């Protein structure tokens, strides 16, 4: 948004796309493994900003398709978000499974994800809900905690290993699911 305020919307869109083109060059030269984070505002904006954000997002998906790499999305979490991301992926010709929804709610079923790959913050409640749905098609992550009352709060990088160790210790999650969530899925996306 501040780019659009500073340079105008058209120039801001050009700057964002140019940044992704640079990232694509880094990927092609072996210095990166994915396009992103790319996305849309997760707060109300004017339609012209929303449309420009979707054009930038579409270009990121096109670059990901050209390079056969994932694109990491940071955007809103509405009921139709994953469906709209899946539709953009289809438009770009990108496999929906290469669209990684960063900071995803625990939406893990095919009906919820529409083929998009959820990456879920590793909170106890998120993990419990995701696992209760009977699938292990998701990744777990750490991030800033999106709480206006705690603007600098983070989920430490040690959170994921601690959660996984607890799963192993209490037998809460089958080892094959742990391998899928923590190794097989990330490897399939980032070691193509």
Label every PLM stretch briefly.
Residues 161-192:
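Mid-to-C-terminal alpha-helical segments outside catalytic/metal-binding sites
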Residues 51, 80-83, 126-135:
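Active-site-adjacent beta->alpha loops and helix N-cap segments on the catalytic face
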Residues 74, 136-154:
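Short acidic/histidine-rich active-site segments
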Residues 67-70, 91-96, 111-119, 134-139:
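Glycine-enriched alpha-helix->loop->beta-strand junction motifs that scaffold or abut catalytic
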Residues 105-106, 114-128, 144-146:
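His/Asp/Glu-enriched short active-site or ligand-binding loop at hydrolase and phosphoryl-transfer sites
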